[in-house]
From Swiss-Prot:
InterPro entries: Homing_endonucl (IPR027434), LAGLIDADG_dom (IPR004860), LAGLIDADG_Endonuclease (IPR051289). This is Probable intron-encoded endonuclease aI3. It holds the Pfam family LAGLIDADG_1. It is an enzyme of class 3 (hydrolase). It comes from Dictyostelium discoideum. Its EC number is 3.1.-.-. Mitochondrial DNA endonuclease involved in intron homing. GO terms for cellular component: mitochondrion. It is found in: Mitochondrion.
Amino acid sequence: MKVEEREYIKKYWVGLMDGVGSIEVNHYRMKNLQYRLVLNVNDSSENMAMLLKIQQVIGGYLIKRKEKALIAWTINNKMQIEDVIKIFEDYNLVTVRKRNQLQFLKENLKRNDVNWYLSERKNKYKKSLIVSNIEEISYFNEWFSGFVEATGSFCIRAQKEKYFRIAHRYDMPLLLNLIIKFNITTKLREQKNEQYAIEIYKKTLLEVLITHFEKYPLLGDKKNSLETFKTR
């Protein structure tokens, strides 16, 4: 695999992690700390191919969760995690929630103290972090494609009305920044359980997004969704 493709996959993976990833710290019988990075995606041949590329570049292993129709990519080896999270030094996580998870994991790696973990785990989302300015993110395009793979939908209604949707929990400021970035005219929709959504119907904006994904391709099953969306 060429260097350019490897770097693309790293940036794309960061977007996936921001969208549907989890950075976890747990304990084993109150004695030892356990660490895990995980991505869960729908079980499809396209998503399997995408995760195999991620495995080739970043490491980890894949598990099929047939009862939930999911494929999980995960790393739970402490030494491997310490190596993999160095990627976030080059390509920072963007969502506040994932950055809080990463900060909590790093602090536990440093302390290796079950008592500290037990006392602080309820506070891991309470630290105030500055909202990322997406205009300053040099890898935004690749990150955005990964984020859309995780959170985006290409929708076609019965009347053949087409629209694009991003839905994400917790990080309302990020979605507001995306509205500004793409000059989206529709308002942010607030739903249950701190879920927020952007819907784009305007043809010129949909064309901008299609052009983006032609240059920065989707790697999983959203690629097929996009092709169907384009031809209807």
